[in-house]
């Protein structure tokens, strides 16, 4: 199979190296990643300056073709699909990210956005994240990525979609299983640290603490874990995501809410 791999941690990150090298013996793997750290850039694109891409060597096994791109994670996948590859890949993978992408993290995540770019182009995609910001034992996550990819090949999905995969930061023999999950709630208590540079000008660092599982019990589905809950239980979490953000459950209530305004507008 032809596999395109991106990330947001950059071309030098050990997570993408583990994933690409693990897949390379059985697949045609092309890596296109940012040339530097691009975490939390969301689905941003570069439109006001050129994008540059250079092939890199020595960081991956010989079977892997790798490019370092000056753009965002989404730029990397878009550029690969539109210019660098001679034909579309069978799958787009992203990661393995250093740190989890749970709940509302996916709205900010360059890792998830890179994979979502594949889905926008009609290609089944997977985003992989390892739930530690410090531990770099990526091989169990890479091994699971290989297993999941083989399962997708043998049992194709009915339509292209994004699978957001979070792997708990525990030894492989302590992983408690694989759970199909829904997106949880993972917000942050933001804190901006105010500092003064040597020239007397003010600047800020974004910091803060994670607030997890703030879901209203009345809205909870007791039969499907959230991704946050699954990781707490040492399970691999697989969450299907889509780019259509329409709040479908709100459409009918909003029709009644909007009717008075529509009537008023009709007489203007």
UniProtKB/Swiss-Prot annotation:
Top-level taxonomic group: Bacteria
InterPro entries with a match to the protein in the record: SurE, SurE-like_Pase/nucleotidase, SurE-like_sf
Catalytic activity: a ribonucleoside 5'-phosphate + H2O = a ribonucleoside + phosphate
EC numbers for this chain: 3.1.3.5
GO CC entries: cytoplasm
UniProt keyword list: Cytoplasm, Hydrolase, Metal-binding, Nucleotide-binding
Cofactor: a divalent metal cation
Chief subcellular location: cytoplasm
Residues annotated as signal peptide: none
Residues the entry annotates as binding a divalent metal cation: 8-9, 39, 97
Enzyme class: hydrolase
Cellular compartments annotated: Cytoplasm
Gene Ontology molecular-function annotations: 3'-nucleotidase activity; 5'-nucleotidase activity; exopolyphosphatase activity; metal ion binding; nucleotide binding
Cofactor note: Binds 1 divalent metal cation per subunit.
Pfam families, A to Z: SurE
Keyword flag S-adenosyl-L-methionine: no
Keyword Transcription: no
Family: Belongs to the SurE nucleotidase family.
PANTHER family referenced in this protein's UniProt entry, alphabetically: 5'-NUCLEOTIDASE SURE, 5'_3'-NUCLEOTIDASE SURE
Biological function: Nucleotidase that shows phosphatase activity on nucleoside 5'-monophosphates.
Name of this chain's protein: 5'-nucleotidase SurE
Organism: Acaryochloris marina (strain MBIC 11017)
Gene: surE
């Amino acid at each position: 199979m032809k596999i395109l791999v991106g990330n947001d941690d950059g071309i030098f990150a050990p997570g993408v190296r583990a994933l690409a090298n693990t897949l390379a013996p059985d697949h045609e793997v092309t890596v296109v990643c940012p040339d530097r750290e691009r975490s939390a850039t969301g689905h941003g694109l570069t439109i006001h300056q050129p994008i540059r891409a250079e092939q890199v060597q020595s960081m991956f096994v010989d079977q892997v073709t790798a490019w370092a791109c000056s753009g965002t994670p989404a730029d990397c996948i878009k550029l690969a699909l539109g210019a660098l590859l001679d034909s579309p890949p069978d799958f787009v993978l992203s990661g393995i990210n250093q740190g989890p992408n749970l709940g509302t993290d996916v709205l900010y995540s360059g890792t998830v956005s890179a994979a979502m770019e594949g889905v926008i182009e009609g290609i089944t995609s997977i985003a992989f994240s390892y739930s530690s910001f410090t531990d770099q034992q990526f091989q169990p996550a890479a091994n699971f990525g290989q297993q999941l990819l083989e399962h997708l090949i043998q049992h194709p999905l009915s339509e292209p979609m994004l699978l957001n995969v979070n792997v708990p930061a525990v030894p492989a023999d302590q992983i408690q299983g694989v759970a199909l999950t829904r997106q949880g709630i993972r917000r942050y208590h933001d804190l901006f640290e105010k500092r003064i540079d040597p020239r007397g000008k003010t600047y800020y660092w974004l910091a803060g603490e994670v607030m997890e599982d703030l879901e209203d019990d009345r809205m909870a589905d007791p039969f499907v874990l959230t991704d946050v809950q699954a990781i707490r239980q040492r399970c691999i979490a697989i969450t299907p995501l889509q780019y259509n953000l329409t709040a479908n459950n709100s459409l009918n209530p909003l029709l009644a809410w909007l009717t008075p305004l529509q009537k008023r507008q009709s007489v203007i």
